[in-house]
């Protein structure tokens, strides 16, 4: 097994409520290598989304250190926002519960744009949609397809950027059981084929059981 794509050491995050500081994450450490998947579970408010936001630089650390693909970030550090933005552009793919497609672009053009921004203009963007089962909808717009089809396109968009790490925050949370299972099948199959690392935040224990490792935030604070 190679070096971790993602390594977290002593991560802490909290917020002020009234006159008190409430701890959300405390002294958390973890690592995920290429080809591995980690499920993050826990009760509502346990910090699942907060953790994923920290892992891609959308929130700042109170304490600790995060390293992604060799880039290291501490609670304080000059130029962190610029470095995080570059990682999100080229290295970290993020899949949200709410589909993050541009409504004015077709599914195919959404994938092409994401691939271009990551510097991976390979011409294989349509193939990614086909691999995710929405090749026939490639020229349709997000509001012309079902929620499940749009989420598949969002997953295709992330894989097209050839990320080292994928962060998926409740990617099937808004879908019915059948569609959720289909999207999850696609996500895990392609993740294993490409060998990227995956961190999946979910309340769905069945989905979490498909990952290599489990982190239950309900027991960490």
Predicted regions and their residues:
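Helix-to-loop junction immediately C-terminal to a conserved catalytic motif
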Residues: 56
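A short, proline-enriched helix->beta-strand linker immediately N-terminal to the Walker B motif
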Residues: 160-164
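Catalytic Walker B motif of ABC-type/P-loop ATPase nucleotide-binding domains
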Residues: 166-169
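Conserved ABC ATPase signature
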Residues: 141-145, 149-151
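Conserved ABC transporter NBD signature motif
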Residues: 64-75
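Short coil-to-helix segment of the ABC ATPase nucleotide-binding domain corresponding to the Q-loop/switch region
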Residues: 105-112
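ABC ATPase NBD coupling module
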Residues: 19, 73-93
